[in-house]
């Protein structure tokens, strides 16, 4: 199982089940049963309490009751490997070999680090004459026995999503056992799951220094590099794997294709993806990746067909339906709409598929002008997404206050002349769904401007400046900006330009359209003072509700609650007003509604700001052939119209909370 297959941590129950583990080790099963039932009265869905209850019941000879408890556990935690392991033990106690084998096989399919399951499988396979499968199970068991028990235990916890328990165990082990590659690799995988990619990179580099032939670690190293948007380096690692392990080339080729997508080589990626199709349900993800690349290239009909193939390859694949809806121009058939309703209502559908289906149904019903029902699905989808986001608006608001306190006019005056003198970057900032893709398409139609993508380079620099922080610690950024020397600031500017180089051709200017960079304009001005910055702004209710309707592939956690979106918009206005005060004239604000009303006038204004001559193809931007990777990709390939400006008014009866949270922002957004 790859590092990305680990499931999300289970929600902690209201009371601590850990004391019951000690009772289990002492085989005090009656006390375990009483304790687990007490916990379940407080938290009926408690994962570990349900498991301990089942274990106690089995050991007390009450196997049917144990199986009932496991059925309850499966309803709430269907990807918890130990429930299937315990179910296997229950069936074995009843001498039901076939269902026992099925249960143990399910357990190890979710979690390879279960020695007891492998041991039971080996014995059951031998007993039923399946010698080949018995040998495979014996081999897996032997592999686990070669690894330190502490590492196996921590790996098992990790694969069940228990990161908070796994991480201290493996760190303690490394403190006493030094550079042990399996332990280091596991800690890297935990870092990947926590999205601490810098730590994961360092650990995997160390593993490969010690064990250069460790292919699983090299594959995970490539995954980390892709997550860090260093796709060219990832391809080097994948090419090494494909050369050394040609019989498993297709195993690596899908990730290689993903790296190609990151580098803008979409046609090549489509061909590579097609080579890894297998005719199984696994093809659903491959068809989806093909469709995304086709959509980026503007191949709308081909993308629709590929999205439909993804839906057909895996029934209930919510992402395929949402991706069709996310084309913005696609209209579902009555049969597709009915199918989506049925899938969303199915109790067996997974949470991720359900939330994708909710957003897709919201868009489909909005297109049919069934606004009340559409809002109900949008609301449900957002509630599902918000429940797992962990977003805290207070953190963004606190960071904004720090930006304002640190990045004063005096701060910049004292550092005048610092940073790189390169004028190449044109930053487009603001909120998502604010017209930034339209501005990018207009500017990228100019002969001297390269349209790249939403580059993560600024965020990577910010992450390095922050270092590793605990949630309980005050952030080093942005205060750390005041500690940087002139040389360090210059190096940051050159690092940014180097990171962007892989996405450019020979045009003198390029666009970085990462909306959230508005939060880092102090850093950007420090390291790239000659860069141009364009603030793409949209009327607040339209902008916020458009974000509420959008399910983002990653990030943008503030968009899954109307109140959170409104608070974020107000914070954005506050910070942009600050940049206008301390860096007057450095940022050009472009109001989306003004572009729709007078496209040529706004195009001329944009090009004047960039110091470039007017070119008529910028007005006819929809004719420009280029890759567009955002949710607005189909919309910017059409002439401008006013259709989207007032769509929020169809949902006005349900937007009271949004208006209340926005407050005076609905009036002052043009100030």
Question: Where do the language-model regions lie?
Answer:
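Structural marker of alpha-solenoid helical repeat scaffolds
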Residues: 42, 76, 110, 127, ...
């Amino acid at each position: 199982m790859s590092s990305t297959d680990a499931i999300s941590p289970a929600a902690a129950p209201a009371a601590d089940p850990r004391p019951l583990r000690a009772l289990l080790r002492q085989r005090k099963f009656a006390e375990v049963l009483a304790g687990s039932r007490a916990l379940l009265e407080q938290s009926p869905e408690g994962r570990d309490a349900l498991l301990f209850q089942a274990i106690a019941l089995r050991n007390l000879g009450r196997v049917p009751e144990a199986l009932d408890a496991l059925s309850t556990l499966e309803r709430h935690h269907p990807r918890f490997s130990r429930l299937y392991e315990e179910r296997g033990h229950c069936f074995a106690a009843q001498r039901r070999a076939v269902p026992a084998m099925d249960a143990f096989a399910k357990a190890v399919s979710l979690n390879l680090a279960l020695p007891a399951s492998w041991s039971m499988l080996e014995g059951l396979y031998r007993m039923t004459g399946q010698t080949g499968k018995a040998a495979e199970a014996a081999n897996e068991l032997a592999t686990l026995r070669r690894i330190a028990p502490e590492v196996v235990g921590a790996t098992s916890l990790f694969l069940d999503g228990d990161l908070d328990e796994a991480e201290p165990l493996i760190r303690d082990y490394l403190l006493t056992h030094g550079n042990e590659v399996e332990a280091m690799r596991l800690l890297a995988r935990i870092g990947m799951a926590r999205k601490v990619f810098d730590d994961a990179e360092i650990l995997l580099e160390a593993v490969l220094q010690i064990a250069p032939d460790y292919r699983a670690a090299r594959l995970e190293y490539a995954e980390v590099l892709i997550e860090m948007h260093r796709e060219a380096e990832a391809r080097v690692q994948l090419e090494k794997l494909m050369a050394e392990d040609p019989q498993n080339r297709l195993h690596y080729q899908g990730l290689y294709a993903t790296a190609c997508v990151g580098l803008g080589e979409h046609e090549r990626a489509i061909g590579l993806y097609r080579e890894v199709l297998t005719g199984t349900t696994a093809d659903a993800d491959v068809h989806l990746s093909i469709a995304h690349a086709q959509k980026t290239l503007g191949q709308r009909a081909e993308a629709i067909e590929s999205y439909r193939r993804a839906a057909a390859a895996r029934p209930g694949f919510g992402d395929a339906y949402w991706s069709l809806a996310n084309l913005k121009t696609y209209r579902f058939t009555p049969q597709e709409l009915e199918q989506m309703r049925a899938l969303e209502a199915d109790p067996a559908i997974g949470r991720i598929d359900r939330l994708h289906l909710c957003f897709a149904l919201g868009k489909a019903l909005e297109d049919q002008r069934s606004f009340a029902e559409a809002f109900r699905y949008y609301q449900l989808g957002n509630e599902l997404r918000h429940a797992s986001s962990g977003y805290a608006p207070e953190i963004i608001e606190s960071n904004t206050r720090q930006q304002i306190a640190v990045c004063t006019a005096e701060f910049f005056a004292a550092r005048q002349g610092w940073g790189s003198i390169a004028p190449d970057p044109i930053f487009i900032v603001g909120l998502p769904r604010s017209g930034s893709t339209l501005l990018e398409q207009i500017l990228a139609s100019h002969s001297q401007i390269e349209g790249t993508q939403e580059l993560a380079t600024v965020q990577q620099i910010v992450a390095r400046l922050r270092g590793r922080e605990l949630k309980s610690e005050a952030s080093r950024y942005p205060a750390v900006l005041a500690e940087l020397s002139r040389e360090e600031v210059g190096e940051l500017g050159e690092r940014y330009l180097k990171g962007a180089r892989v996405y450019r051709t020979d045009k003198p200017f390029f666009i970085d359209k990462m909306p959230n960079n508005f939060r880092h304009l102090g850093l950007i001005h420090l390291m790239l003072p000659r860069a141009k910055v364009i603030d793409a702004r949209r009327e607040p209710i339209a902008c916020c509700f458009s974000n509420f309707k959008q399910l983002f592939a990653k990030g943008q956690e503030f968009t899954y609650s109307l109140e959170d979106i409104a608070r974020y918009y107000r914070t954005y206005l506050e910070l942009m007003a600050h940049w206008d005060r301390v860096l007057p004239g450095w940022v050009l604000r472009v109001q989306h509604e003004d572009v729709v009303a007078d496209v040529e006038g706004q195009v001329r204004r944009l090009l004047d700001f960039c110091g470039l001559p007017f070119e008529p193809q910028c007005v006819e931007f929809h004719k420009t052939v280029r890759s567009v990777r955002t949710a607005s990709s189909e919309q910017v390939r059409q002439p401008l119209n006013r259709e989207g400006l007032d769509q929020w008014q169809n949902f006005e009866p349900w937007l009271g909370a949004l208006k209340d949270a926005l407050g005076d922002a609905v009036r002052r957004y043009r100030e």
